[in-house]
């Protein structure tokens, strides 16, 4: 009788445990690099197999540099009002496949009338670069030849210890300057 009671108690406890634990396990972990579902579907359709760069994709030194400046933010995703219209806009660094090789691509996604517009801006090569935003302002290229006066936040696409490129919306198109080379 004692064995049967113990078996029923253990079985009930296990069932209750599974009922509470299973939903927590079934939910995906949020690492700050997750995309809205509808955008994820659009990215998957346009770039099959692509994914957003995360901290694990960075070289050890690059991860330290990024975390020093941006904490636990996602290195492959930044939300900003790039176009100045207040509509959802994200800059993404995607890891894509080019044959057997990994490649990276910077894209800007902009939600207009419940549809995401995806605009490729640049490629970054096989070693994962990062992206972040900067406030509106005056920016001069590394050579001192070109100046951008941004009225909206800008995008910085960077491969630490190699290069950094700034992208600003001019109202008519995207202006690009090298801020580190």
Language-model regions: role of each:
Residues 77, 84-94, 146-156:
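Acidic/hydrophobic-patterned starts of short beta strands in beta-sheet-rich repeat architectures
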